[in-house]
Amino acid sequence: MIPEKTSQRKASKRVFNTTGICNPTEHYMVDLTQRLSEVRKLVDDGKNFMINRARQFGKTTMLHALAEYLSQDYLVISMDFQMQMSDAKFRNENSFSLAFARAFENSFRITEEGRSQEYQTALQAFTEERKEIGNQFELVELFEAISKLCAAIPKKIVLMIDEVDSATNNQVFLDFLAQLRGYYINRSRFATFQSVILAGVCDIRNLKRKMRPDEEHKDNSPWNIAAEFDIDMSFSAEQINHMLLDYASENDSSIDTEQIAREIHDYTSGYPYLVSRLCQLLDEMYQSGMDGAWTHAGILEAVRKLVRESNSLFEDMAKKVKDYPDLGTMLRDILFCGKGIPFNLGTELVSIGTMFGFLKDEDGQVEISNRIFEIWFYNLFIAQDAIDSKTYDAGWQMKGQFVSESGRK
């Protein structure tokens, strides 16, 4: 179905967003209600967990939405290690503990509860303890002060820390996790956080592996008390359809939203950034007056534009392949040779590729996670090998299997 064009289209009230945090008043978004409800169950049960997903997979947006979702019943302290903790703060326990405490205080003050006298009094006691101990304020003292604060206020505290990848290769951060573990185990004796939620690309076991390559400590992570976070954060075709229905309504557009949603999902497998970027490109074509923007032909054009552009996600993917050459070799084998590799997260390359969002489990076999990534990796490797005419010629002949006129493999 070709969308009807009108000369007096409504100005779009919202936009598709691919940078920063999404919020429903400014951006077209999928409905997160069910997902937030599932995460809340973990929080209500007092679980600590890690949201580790690939780059631009909606982690930060999820944390912000979750903070608002929990705010009626919990005091949510939201921190960001990338913004609040520089590398210098990880020099030793004292510098880390002081910096963490100050960041914690700042995040506490901007909460709604932080403006009440009762909460301000409890926070003031925490701050005074930090200042009084000074150079001797280390992790033990930090957690003792946190425990006192937790006991002094009515609401239970949920601590969220985004961008924990910036703590990679810092022993003091692992010691911080060990303190969290100790208080979690002894929570019946000492007041502590209701729940601790960490977010980043790497999981804590991978941080541990990079810190301590020796076998004795390889799998002995202080985060082994964490619950599994297996909530699907990708977008389903149904969720994409509901988002497109909002868009069509606001833009007075007749779009076959179900069909377009299925095609977008077919190319992206619901990878949040890729979904939003394709929609963004389609909207740009539509607003510029292109006939058939929100159609099959429009999607083919948007895909071609997307895989040829430079963006932060693709730049990060190229860097990862360079940093992990064996992973690049495996991707080549899958793309060019059709090599079958059993999916087993105990295999380091499979685990790393899955963590980066490059790979997925498809009926027990390793596959590249979506068609956009297939096309992009294919183009990357062909460009790298262009000097080898045999590789280039063979690859060029295969190109049609990825984007044909029908849009299918």
Model segments located where?
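Walker A/P-loop-proximal flanking segment of P-loop NTPase domains
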Residues: M1-L70, K148
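Winged-helix-like regulatory helical subdomains adjacent to P-loop NTPase cores
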Residues: I2, S236-F356, E362-D363, Y392-G395, ...
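The catalytic "switch" region of P-loop NTPases
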Residues: G20-I21, K156, S166-Q259, D266-Y267, ...
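A conditional alpha-helix N-cap/helix-loop micro-motif detector
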Residues: M29-L32, L139, S254-T257
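P-loop NTPase nucleotide-binding core
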Residues: K41, D45-F57, T61-F176, Q194, ...
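Short, amphipathic alpha-helical interaction segments positioned at domain boundaries
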Residues: N311, F373-V403
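Minor-groove-contacting beta-hairpin "wing" of winged helix-turn-helix DNA-binding domains
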Residues: Q365-N370
